[in-house]
UniProtKB/Swiss-Prot annotation:
It holds the Pfam family ATP-synt_A. GO terms for cellular component: chloroplast thylakoid membrane; plasma membrane; proton-transporting ATP synthase complex. Belongs to the ATPase A chain family. InterPro entries: ATP_syn_F0_a_bact/chloroplast, ATP_synth_F0_asu, ATP_synth_F0_asu_AS, F0_ATP_A_sf. This is ATP synthase subunit a, chloroplastic. It is found in: Plastid, Chloroplast thylakoid membrane. The chain crosses the membrane at residues 38-58, 96-116, 135-155, 200-220, 221-241. It is a multi-pass membrane protein. Key component of the proton channel; it plays a direct role in the translocation of protons across the membrane.
Amino acid sequence: MHIIQNTITILNNFVDISGVEVGQHLYWQIGNFEVHGQVLLTSWFVLAVLLGLAVLTVRDPQTIPTGQQNFAEYLLEFIRDLARTQIGEEEYISWVPFIGTLFLFIFVSNWSGALVPWGVVKLPHGELAAPTNDINTTVALALLTSVAYFYAGLAKKGLSFFGKYIQPTPILLPINILEDFTKPLSLSFRLFGNILADELVVAVLVSLVPLVVPIPVMLLGLFTSGIQALIFATLAAAYIGESLENHH
């Protein structure tokens, strides 16, 4: 009973974390729910960019790829190699779409914060920023990773998947349970903190010094944004691979 109460407390903490606010927000009332409108707007923008690039890439496929198709195939190979390395040769192929979607969404979201002049768009309330600049987005991505983790383990092993919680000794049961719920929490905090800090540093420098001075910081932000997307996707794949591996 104590373990169940701890688990419920952790889930409630996720809900509390999603209420953390940085800056001003535009709220939409949907039924009995209040949602962050600017997060949905920027997320839809990112999805539109990804869908647009996908359509441009596949509309005229060639036997010998060139240009956009060549880049898309290289990107696919990169994601497949990442999934193969972290998940394993036998299981990785079915998880390539999930890992690829995570990586591309986070990557484009992060870059949109540095490349898209969100401040030009004026809202009645709040301000636009990268989707990953809002902890609601990062917590949602982390929870998706957690759901994928349990789905992968249960789909392969059934209820025997839960046997790993009493290995190597039943005494570690509470710690093993907490570990699985704190993994996505660390993922969301890492991504949210890095993207928010990067945008705040650039905003402060732009307000204090001429535009040319913050450019090196912006370039560094683009690099670290890509690294953060890679780290998130790699750790998500590693967690899924961990749930699929055999425990003896």
